[in-house]
């Protein structure tokens, strides 16, 4: 039959055909996706529920003028299954994958809240940083040369060649926001700040280096899009979703993206409500280091993991990369194609423009920063310096 796009009606029939519901069951189906690339259907018969996710052959945010391979759905399904090998508590269960229709049937997580929405609404997730720190440590370690035999790693790397979505990252994170490109999207009040950013040669040279790292450093399996909209949370649970951008890349990429999105939320808050975001930034790194170190000592398969001086160098390199990648993400989410609600939904225009200017300023500081040590307090320090300088609307 070949590929076809599901509707709410055909999604129900698909689920019945594959035995998820009885043929006579009264199944309620709603398309609930708010992302840029896929359809997401929730199906519920009153007793059980599932999620059907289907990749579209184009970017939904743009339309059919931006074609994409539906093979990314297979990559997403494989990534979730690999994550589940190491951290099953932190990902949804994958029930099945249909490669021809680019459909993945997964656990319904509607008992939880998308973390971005929860943070905007002022919800608190005390275990978020512990869970994400441990998720990152396990996945990044076990799919790298440190936790996986080199021949196995090369084979695994080959299954995550993801050209379409890597090209999106290359363009939308590292290229377009730093020059005159049609994909950029920002308010006219930011034009002077944007012009200054685009003319900053030192900044562009640093961004070029971070882009080159993303292009060439195939160090470990990365989620590739680990922002707070790709995580479900409750006070006791955390689930990472949507790894369709998964590929082999730099250790620091996912860490930097996650931290950047916490910083964006902090910029949207009043000063007295920001401390919880810095708690999560600092704890994410500390749990990552603690867990990664234990795995390195106890599970390392690469010969030089026995050299005590090697681990601190690796952690410093990861931290340095995370800082720069976080800076790129801050700028991309402020003036690039895909914004975040944390900033865009600030109702007061003056406050919103001020927060966006501060995001751009902080992004530049992080990209240019030459870190000499893996001091996680750096994010709090540069944030406070940026805000106190009085970047005004």
UniProtKB/Swiss-Prot annotation:
Keywords assigned: Amino-acid biosynthesis, ATP-binding, Kinase, Methionine biosynthesis, Nucleotide-binding, Transferase
Top-level EC class as recorded in UniProt: transferase
Annotated pathway: Amino-acid biosynthesis; L-methionine biosynthesis via salvage pathway; S-methyl-5-thio-alpha-D-ribose 1-phosphate from S-methyl-5'-thioadenosine (hydrolase route): step 2/2
Disulfide bonds: none
EC number(s) given by UniProt: 2.7.1.100
Reactions that this protein is recorded to catalyse: 5-(methylsulfanyl)-D-ribose + ATP = 5-(methylsulfanyl)-alpha-D-ribose 1-phosphate + ADP + H(+)
Binding site for ATP: 38, 53, 107-109, 242-244
Gene Ontology molecular function, alphabetical: ATP binding; S-methyl-5-thioribose kinase activity
Residues given in the record as substrate binding sites: 225, 332
A Pfam entry, by short name: APH
UniProt-listed GO biological process terms: L-methionine salvage from methylthioadenosine
Organism domain of life: Bacteria
Record-linked InterPro entries: Aminoglycoside_PTrfase, Kinase-like_dom_sf, Methylthioribose_kinase
Family per record: Belongs to the methylthioribose kinase family.
Function: Catalyzes the phosphorylation of methylthioribose into methylthioribose-1-phosphate.
Description of how the protein assembles with itself and partners: Homodimer.
Annotated HAMAP family: Salvage_MtnK
PANTHER family membership: METHYLTHIORIBOSE KINASE (PTHR34273:SF2)
Protein name from the UniProt record: Methylthioribose kinase
Organism: Bacillus cereus (strain ATCC 14579 / DSM 31 / CCUG 7414 / JCM 2152 / NBRC 15305 / NCIMB 9373 / NCTC 2599 / NRRL B-3711)
